[in-house]
Amino acid sequence: MKNSEATLRIQGKIISIRGQVAEVEFPEAKPRLRDVIVLVDDPSTQMELYAASIRNTYYCVVLSPTSRITRGARVINRGSSVTIPAGKEVLGRVIDAFGNPIDSKGIIETTEHIPIYRSPLGYHEIIPKSEILDTGIKIIDLFCPLVKGGKLGLVGGAGVGKTTLLTELIHNIVILREEENAISIFAGVGERTREAHELLETLTLKGVLPRTVLVLGAMGEHPAIRFRTAYTAITLAEYFRDTMKKNVLFFVDNMYRFAQAGNELSTVTDVIPSEDGYQPTLTSEMATVQERLMSGRGGMVSTVEAIYVPNDDVLDQAVQSIFVYLDSIVVFSRDIYQKNFLPAIDILESHSSALTPDLVGEKHYTAAFQAQSLLKKAVKLERIVSLIGESELTPEDRILYKRANILRNFMTQPLYVVEDQSHRPGIYVPRQKTVEDTVRILAGEFDNYTPDEFLYIGTTENLHAKRT
């Protein structure tokens, strides 16, 4: 009798349905946010409590087909949040936001399930960053290095090469370097299914899929699915870090879509937006995912995030909410892309807190600082050249202007993942070699070469081959 009374206390009923959101009334016991609500007559139909509505009523995001739900249907609070399968059995698999396999390889046979909502590490548990992770991409390694255990953001508008460079980073770090004791996790949040399929084929072909997990919530999915895809992927990263004691390489495309999905959810649940049009909980939602991507005693979590910039406006509030968590910010430029300087990265707009003598070394730090100074001078000289021509510059300025163009062209690089489109074989350049070549360019060793000879070469050793 007591059990039946307890069940009645946590029962409720559906009073309205709008798309993927159901309004549920619990007249007595109040459920907790993120509790899973199921139909009494069909426990396989699940909802997640998202927000409070009015007295004793709550908005629930439907996680199953809405065709199963009707007004007046009785529901029961399961008393726990969404869980996903974990363990070594998920390696090599492609799953959705709820841990269901979507790769036609059958069910994931594991007895271990973990909730997707967890608290981040405490301050005393976080391991400081002290090592640079080489990417083999000159412009990133020199100006915006990826810290092992840190976060790097690829920031840009549509069609400027963010996903291409993200895929190249996966290729260089996961496939070429084959980091020891490392697991790779790719979170596809609100992006194209085609890109995830191409990545899956590449990982399978190169034989690294068994050390990788892909978590996908494509752009065609409901915002509730896209929103939870990020949590699922991060939960797996934490599991491999803390339980399996592995280093984790975490890639997400696209973090802006996570913020966008949260905004769409707040709209359908009648939440009044903030002044900039986004959900008022944007900052806290971003914190719940970013602060969990930390390195602990179990292992390091190194993160690369593609970040879409709507209307090429870097000051967009969703974009700004991500910036505060990044160690290195790589900014893409449409103007540079149209000039065919690839990767189309704006060196002077990009920056990194990891670019310090303690982390990268004195030689690297000095080379990067001097290179940025030279490029800044070249911007001023460019204005003069556009008005009166290069011949009107002083001899000293003419040398600096040419040297800056040599340096800018040297930062272009053929990428492995677009070899079939560019018809140029990809090149991996060690970070120390990039620093050495930059020092030589700044010293004027190559002033007798033309800037065009530095386009899409790997190192300065390739100059002779290009001339012949």
Indicate where each model-derived feature is located.
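Conserved catalytic/coupling modules of large nucleotide/cofactor-utilizing molecular machines
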Residues: 235, 257, 267-468
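Residue-level signature of catalytic and energy-coupling elements of molecular machines
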Residues: 14, 19, 72, 94, ...
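P-loop NTPase nucleotide-binding/switch module
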Residues: 73-75, 82, 89, 102-150, ...
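Walker A/P-loop NTP-binding active-site region of P-loop NTPases
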Residues: 143, 147-202
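Nucleotide-state-sensitive switch-loop elements of NTP-binding domains
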Residues: 180-182, 191-239, 267-285
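Acidic-enriched and Gly/Ser
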Residues: 2-10, 17-135
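Phosphate-binding/switch loop-helix module in NTP-utilizing enzymes
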Residues: 224-262
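Conserved catalytic network of the ASCE P-loop NTPase/AAA+ motor domain
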Residues: 145-147, 173-180, 204-209, 239-244, ...
